[in-house]
Regions:
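Hydrophobic membrane-targeting signal helices
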Residues: 15-20, 69, 106-112
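Active-site-proximal cofactor/substrate-binding loop regions of enzyme domains
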Residues: 58
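Alpha-helical transmembrane segments
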Residues: 62-75
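N-terminal secretory/membrane targeting signals
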Residues: 1-26
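Non-transmembrane, membrane-proximal soluble domains of secreted or membrane proteins
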Residues: 26-53, 73-207
């Protein structure tokens, strides 16, 4: 299958793509973690900023709806309001609940599109990494290094050493230089595979 260019990663501290060993403890999720991993790229930093913006918008909307529901339950229950209102419409309220959501969507859309366009920016690569997905392992090649390559397979649970994370430890890890722009050519040998680096805000389907 022909390799396709899926991503151009600009990394300030890209060290490895697969996890294995205690030295990687800071690069994986931790028990009861409530937030993202520490951002390792400008893209992930912007994703976090956008996530935080959405979090506060959603929180405010949720609290407003909750307060409104409580108010309606208390004020318009049968005991407090034995004679129900026969009001059919309220122009002001209808305008408000139309205009306010539009404003909220615009506030969300502007940074969202900025983030999308920012993710499409790239610089000329300093080196290339070929990634091929298989059932159930990855193959990596370094075209700039004489097409050197190897397979990277997950270490089974019974073979894990103390401190090695389950489902994240592999027998051969990918090592890349820091402060280097790296182009990733990605494809799959059989079915669709997903290749991800959460700290870099990167998640791609290998086809």
């Amino acid at each position: 299958m022909t390799l396709r260019l899926h991503a151009l990663i600009t990394g300030a501290a890209l060290f490895l793509l697969s996890f294995g060993g205690s030295a990687l403890a800071d690069g994986i999720a931790t028990p009861w973690q409530m937030n993202f991993q520490e951002a390792a790229s400008p893209v992930m930093e912007r994703i976090e900023d956008f996530h935080n913006l959405l979090f506060w918008i959603i929180t405010i909307i949720t609290l407003f709806v909750l307060i409104l529901l409580i108010y309606v339950i208390v004020k318009f229950n049968e005991k407090a309001n034995p004679v129900p209102s026969k009001t059919t419409h309220n122009t002001f309220i209808e305008v408000v609940w139309t205009v306010v959501p539009i404003i909220i969507l615009v506030v969300i859309a502007v940074p969202s599109f900025k983030l999308l366009f920012f993710q499409d920016k790239y610089e000329n690569p300093d080196m290339t990494l070929k990634v091929v997905g298989h059932q159930w392992y990855w193959s990596y090649k370094y075209p700039d290094q004489g097409d050197f390559g190897f397979d990277s397979q997950m270490v089974q649970a019974e073979d894990l050493k103390p401190g090695q994370p389950r489902l994240l430890t592999v027998d051969n890890t990918v090592v890349l230089p820091i402060d280097t722009n790296i182009r990733v050519l990605q494809t799959a040998d059989d079915v669709i595979h997903n290749w991800a680096m959460p700290a870099f805000g990167l998640k791609l389907d290998a086809v």
